[in-house]
Amino acid sequence: MHRLFILRHAKAATHPPTASGRDHDRPLAARGAAVLPRVARSIADQLEGHPLDLVLCSTSTRTRETVDLVAQAEPAVAAARLKLDDKLYLADPARLLKTLRKVHDDKATVLLCGHNPGLHQLALLLLGDDGSDNGSEHVLARLRYDLPTAGLVVVDLDGSWTSVGTGPGIRGAKLRAFVVPSDT
């Protein structure tokens, strides 16, 4: 079994615009940075003492800052191999799945940090209608509504990374947790 942590970047600054004027370069807002220690605790809880093997992160400033601040608060994230990938910037679910399918199966736990709407759509795709068999139907219903900034979705996946997201209804993907920082 593999565990996937899907983390949307924390709240980014909107004004003033960056010197470059590019969305890619927007940093985190102070309130976005402030919630990340709580997100780090949630990741630690869901790792259950196991190491985090790999962090896949968009190259945008806000995603890199999100991962950096989570790593400062959680040693397992700091110890994980970090791979920055410019193809994850505003990636759609197809691109995200392509990236996940390249992960080696010896990586049991992977954190993917990126952007909506792709991350939200990926989580919904993986979970389909059968993603909750552990009494978390209300949590899955809430996730269908939104993946907010700094939202964390933890999914357990059967099978290999190369087969993630294949087949109708994506059988074998189970929602383990959906954490919204304002709830912690």
Predicted regions and their residues:
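A glycine-rich beta-strand to alpha-helix segment
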Residues: A108-D129
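Conserved histidine-centered catalytic loops in small-molecule metabolism enzymes
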Residues: L52-E74, G159-T184
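Short phosphate-binding loop-to-helix
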Residues: K87-D105
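Active-site-proximal alpha-helix that buttresses catalytic centers in soluble enzyme cores
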Residues: H2-R3, L7-K87, L127-D133, L147
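Short, well-ordered alpha-helical microsegments
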Residues: T63-T66, P93, L119-H120
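Residue-level preference for the first positions of well-ordered beta-strands
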Residues: L4, T109-L111, L152
